[in-house]
């Protein structure tokens, strides 16, 4: 859910969602764009401040200037590299638990630049009927790699 109490309480994370999943689950692009950041060289995780900047991350730039961010990916599993174009459903990497993390999950957010500051913005999920919805705490969702 948005505005989480544990770690989603600042401008960069306020509208991020954590999606629990098994280690090694393929992560796929939610929108088309260009890969602008790939970091997948860290293997540890923990809940201390030491781990805040250690998460493995892939960021994709979209035509509207926003970025989608996929964090806590498994070390050495990035399939894409900076400069690659991706389409909806393309495999990016595998899920993990790198950096500031208490277990395997995807930390996903949509980010825009606002006054030289990156901030997370609200986004919607789309169900199997094409209906948009906002995630809620403890909501169970099953994903698909292609719409």
How would you label these PLM feature ranges?
Residues 14, 58-82:
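Active-site region of chymotrypsin-like
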Residues 32, 64-68, 88:
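Loop/turn elements at helix/coil->beta-strand transitions in domains of secreted/extracellular proteins
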Residues 27, 33-35, 83-95:
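A structural signal for short beta-strand/turn segments enriched in small hydrophobics and glycine
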Residues 28, 48, 78-87, 109-147:
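Acidic, glycine-rich catalytic/binding loops that coordinate metals and/or anionic ligands
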Residues 69-74, 102-111:
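Histidine-centered catalytic micro-motifs
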Residues 37, 72-75, 94-97, 112:
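A residue-level detector for short acidic-glycine micro-motifs
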């Amino acid at each position: 859910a948005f505005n989480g109490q544990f770690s989603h309480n600042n401008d960069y994370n306020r509208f991020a969602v954590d999606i629990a999943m098994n280690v090694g689950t393929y992560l796929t692009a939610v929108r088309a764009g260009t890969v602008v950041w790939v970091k997948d060289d860290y293997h540890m995780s923990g809940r201390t401040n030491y781990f805040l900047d250690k998460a493995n991350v892939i960021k994709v730039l979209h035509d509207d200037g926003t970025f989608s961010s996929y964090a806590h990916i498994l070390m050495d599993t990035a399939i894409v590299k900076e400069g690659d174009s991706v389409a909806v459903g393309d495999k990016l990497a595998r899920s993990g638990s790198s950096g500031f993390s208490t277990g395997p999950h995807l930390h996903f957010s949509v980010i825009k630049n606002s006054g030289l500051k990156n901030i997370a913005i609200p986004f919607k999920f789309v169900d199997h009927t094409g209906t948009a919805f906002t995630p809620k705490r403890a909501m169970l969702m099953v994903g698909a790699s292609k719409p």
